[in-house]
From Swiss-Prot:
Monomer. Belongs to the methylthiotransferase family. MiaB subfamily. It comes from the Bacteria. The lineage of its organism: Bacteria, Pseudomonadati, Pseudomonadota, Gammaproteobacteria, Pasteurellales. The gene is miaB. Its EC number is 2.8.4.3. This is tRNA-2-methylthio-N(6)-dimethylallyladenosine synthase.
Length: 475
């Protein structure tokens, strides 16, 4: 059987895209996924352009693959993702042995591209933005464990001054609500218990309904939570300026929506936020968190931070540290600023020394780690509901799973617990994990109800006396 290898860099959207590529090429060409690139007949590199020197990293990887192509002339090499979208034809200028260059919105065309290359075409570059077409061309979802990612939209319209996403993934396009619900219901039938809704800015979701109406993100959350078998709902990533009160109301009355939120602020200084074109202040961000904690007192918050943005003063950084303490973030993805070509911020003078940037990043991460450990220690002696993912990586005789607030818990259990929920009493707290004992199995919780995907769609559609279809969100 012919084999496929995909090297994936970057965000969860890229991970999701790579899984779809693998499923697609397995269904169309029978390609079997391998983690050994030297065995592959098709090599795909799914790239990310967020970090500094992303392009050089791509060409370095391609240089290693070039040698394999010399020994294996029929080997097909493709480059996708955000660097491909940015660079386009320039990739082949520097690496003419690359056969296919495709963007995040054209991965569904891979089967046709491969056929053309095998048919004698020299090379194909397709980095267009055909809106939502790719989701209509992908195979049915295939569950791999009790958790799954589902893309609900693509692109971003916010144009933050440091970010390449609007240029590499295009503007915001939402999937129709029926398509999203049907995919999740199919996954639930396969045993998925937790779904993570993906998008560059999920709270901008505006999905078309079957009758031409619009479903908001808050309404979508309620509909997803109503699917039997889905007992946890997460999402990533969201933007503060569209974190509206109707979303906060979902936290008030939808227990399936986890008490853990990733809401990036990037900086705690209003002056820096203005230069970043974030279009909100630190006070407005804190107001959202205050409202959330009024309806979910135990919710834990994570964020992204960019340290050393051009023009960030020592006082600006201290304001960020103050916000970190005030919000009491549980976790963060923190980076030293690096200019991305083509973004407005790339034209700003990079006036902060590398030494100063590293010192600020170390202070920020130390503070967040301290707060995270305080949250973990507070869990000692409590009961936590854990979704069991499989054997522990450290000890195959033990099981591992995650709490609602994203903590890894290791414990002694039986194989029949995998894919189900258990209640664990936390007995030990470590830097990167927790440990505990099982106090309750899922059989004692009465959680799971099996329901077909088609019936979920039927339940979300109702017709009035005149036969006009409408959605009923509060099921």
């Amino acid at each position: 059987m012919a084999k496929l290898h995909i090297t994936t860099w970057g965000c969860q959207m890229n991970e999701y895209d790579s899984s779809k590529m693998a499923d697609l090429l397995n269904s169309t060409h029978g390609l079997e996924l391998t983690d050994k690139p030297e065995e592959a007949d098709v090599l795909l590199l799914n790239t990310c352009s967020i970090r500094e020197k992303a392009q050089e990293k791509v060409f370095s990887q391609l240089g290693r693959w070039k040698n394999w192509k010399k020994d294996k002339p029929d080997l097909i090499i493709g480059v996708g993702g955000c660097v491909a979208s940015q660079e386009g034809e320039h990739i082949r200028d520097r690496a003419p042995f690359v056969d296919i260059v495709f963007g995040p919105q054209t991965l569904h065309r891979l089967p046709e591209m491969i056929n053309k290359i095998r048919g004698g075409d020299r090379a194909i570059v397709d980095i267009s933005f055909p809106e939502i077409e790719k989701f209509d061309r992908l195979p049915e979802p295939r569950a791999e464990g009790p958790t799954a990612f589902v893309s609900i939209m693509e692109g971003c319209n916010k144009y933050c001054s440091f970010c390449v996403v609007p240029y590499t993934r295009g503007e915001e396009v939402s999937r129709p609500v029926d398509d999203v619900l049907f995919e999740i219901a199919q996954l639930a039938e396969q045993g998925v218990r937790e779904v993570n809704l993906l998008g560059q800015n999920v709270n901008a979701y505006r999905g078309e309904t079957f009758d031409g109406g619009i479903c908001t993100f808050a309404e979508l959350l309620r509909l997803v939570a109503a699917i039997d078998g889905i007992d946890r709902v997460r999402y990533t990533t969201s933007h503060p300026i569209e974190f509206t009160d109707d979303i906060i109301e979902v936290y008030r009355d939808t227990p399936e929506l986890v008490s853990f939120l990733h809401l990036p602020i990037q900086s705690g200084a209003d002056r820096v936020l203005t230069m970043m074109k974030r279009n909100h202040t630190a006070l407005e961000y804190k107001a959202i968190i205050r409202k959330l904690r009024e309806v979910r007192p135990n919710i834990q918050i994570s964020s992204d931070f960019i340290v050393g943005f051009p023009g960030e003063t020592a006082e600006d950084f201290e304001q960020t540290m103050k916000v970190i303490e005030q919000v009491n973030f549980d976790m963060s993805f923190s980076f030293i600023y690096s200019a991305r070509p083509g973004t407005p911020a790339a034209d700003l003078p990079d006036d902060i020394s590398e030494e100063e940037k590293k010192e600020r990043l170390a202070r920020l991460q130390q503070r967040i780690n301290h707060q995270a450990m305080q949250f973990s220690r507070a869990m000692l002696g409590t009961e936590q509901r854990v979704l069991v993912e499989g054997p522990s990586k450290k000890d195959i005789m033990e099981l591992t799973g995650r709490t609602e607030n994203n903590r890894i818990v290791n414990f002694q259990g039986t194989p029949d617990m995998i894919g189900k929920f258990v209640d664990i009493k936390i007995t030990d707290v470590y830097t990167n994990s927790l440990r505990g004992d099982v106090v309750r199995t899922e059989d004692e919780m009465g959680l799971r109800v099996v329901e077909s995907a088609a019936s979920v769609i039927a339940r979300t559609r109702k017709e009035d006396d005149l036969g006009v279809g409408k959605y009923v969100v509060n099921l």
